[in-house]
A protein has these predicted regions:
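A structural signal for small-residue-enriched, beta-sheet-centric alpha/beta enzyme cores
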Residues: 1-75, 79-90, 99-407
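Generic structural marker for isolated residues within well-ordered, non-membrane alpha-helices
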Residues: 95
């Protein structure tokens, strides 16, 4: 596997465009489009929040009931959530506009929205945005990058990644982009993720690969514990790499899954590290667990602990908060057997041994915790399973950003 420059346009046959449609923001792009030269197999995972935005309902129907998908239209600024039948109508009108200008069937158009809940979409601006983007569709790296910028809301940086692998003597590319900074606690931030590949793979295995991988990537991140109404991850495969089609769980499938995991994990970590107001990526590894599920529950409990997140912001080795968060997670373990370590680019040090603090240097701990990426490793000595979760520190700016979000 080789990491390359680019995102959603890295794979053969995929193009992207973006524009400033004036949906909510001024003087910045707020719409993006992804287009495949040929119809794609489509897979998707969506929010588990009972309150589902109109685009989530629309895309779920396209992914599970349509034979193919060929375009994705994304807007930032307004979520099109809690908008009733009118909101669903806007999804259809968006798809009908794409059908008119690109000749794609309505049920092969995916839509996604992110932004303020409860506001109706300015559909005329959406349609005008589509008109503006179609002539701009290109397969170059820059177009993909600009699209990744256009879907941002409170994000401070765009997020994209791409890799190539060899399958059956053919080069297969997987690329993706995402947005997410606040309301990030997927269970499938506001999290939108779009992954494209030129791999030839059956729709069934494409969906299975995505559903399984989401559990270990996007579902293992949290910024603020809020599961969005709009969380969506879409994976499109157009087959233009011309590799032997992957129709069974063989070595080719495993290679594809490894590359997909790299793309999704990279995007997930980019979202966690770009949490609203965040200054540090906070990674929690639980090792020595009895089961992977036990390790997942423990690690996610720690990254969602507000007191722990504040301690990371303060570069404070307040290990009691970590042990406390593990204790109320609901997962059984013996606290008197836990070893805890902090690690970063500045070094690694043990903080507790068998549930009791060791003699460590607070100054050294502060130095380790002052890096932009910090890891806490807890060994619970019950087995050989492990899991990793990603979050961020909690700062004053998080409150400021969200207090002013609608203004």
């Amino acid at each position: 596997m080789k990491q390359i420059t680019g995102g959603v346009t890295a794979a053969k046959g995929f193009q992207a465009a973006s524009t400033a449609a004036g949906i909510k923001y001024k003087d910045r792009k707020d719409m993006a489009m992804i287009y495949s030269e040929v119809p794609c197999k489509a897979a998707g995972t969506f929010t588990t929040n009972i309150v589902k935005a109109a685009p989530v309902k629309w895309d779920h129907n396209v992914v599970y009931n349509s034979k193919a998908a060929q375009a994705v239209v994304v807007n930032a600024g307004i979520a099109n959530a809690c908008t009733g039948e009118e909101g669903m109508g806007y999804c259809r009108q968006t798809a009908e506009k794409v059908e008119k200008v690109l000749g794609i069937a309505v049920d092969e158009v995916l839509v996604a929205s992110t932004g303020v809940i409860g506001m109706q979409l300015p559909i005329d601006r959406i349609c005008n945005g589509i008109d503006a983007m179609v002539p701009l569709l290109k397969g170059d790296t820059g177009s993909g990058t600009e699209a990744s910028k256009a879907i941002m809301t409170t994000d401070t940086k765009n997020k994209e990644v791409a890799v190539t692998i060899e399958i059956g003597g053919k080069t297969v590319t997987i690329g993706g982009m995402c947005k997410g900074s606040g309301m990030i606690h997927p269970n499938m931030c506001t999290m939108l993720s779009f992954v494209t590949t030129d791999a030839a793979i059956s729709k069934e295995l494409l969906q299975e690969a995505l559903s399984a991988d989401v559990q270990d990537t996007y579902n293992m991140i949290s910024v603020d514990g809020d599961t969005s109404t709009n969380d969506t991850c879409l994976l499109l495969a157009n087959g233009l790499a011309e590799n032997p089609e992957i129709t069974e769980k063989n070595a080719d499938y495993e290679e594809f899954c490894k590359a997909l995991n790299f793309v999704n994990e990279t995007l997930a970590k980019k979202m966690a590290g770009d949490g609203e107001g965040a200054t540090a990526l906070f990674e929690v590894k639980i090792i020595g667990a009895e089961s992977k599920e036990q390790a997942k529950v423990l690690s996610k409990s720690v990254i969602t602990s507000s007191l722990t997140k504040v301690a990371i912001y303060g570069h404070d080795a307040n290990w009691g908060r970590i042990l406390c968060a593990m204790g109320y997670s609901g997962a059984a373990f013996d606290p008197e057997k836990v070893d805890l370590f902090f690690e970063s680019a500045a070094g690694k040090m043990q903080i507790i041994k068998n549930g009791v603090a060791v003699d460590y240097s607070e100054e050294e701990a502060t130095r380790i915790l002052s890096e932009p990426a910090v890891t806490a490793i807890a060994d619970i000595k019950m087995g050989n399973a492990s899991a990793t979760a990603w979050g961020c520190d909690l700062t004053y700016d998080y409150v400021k950003i969200n207090a002013d979000y609608r203004s």
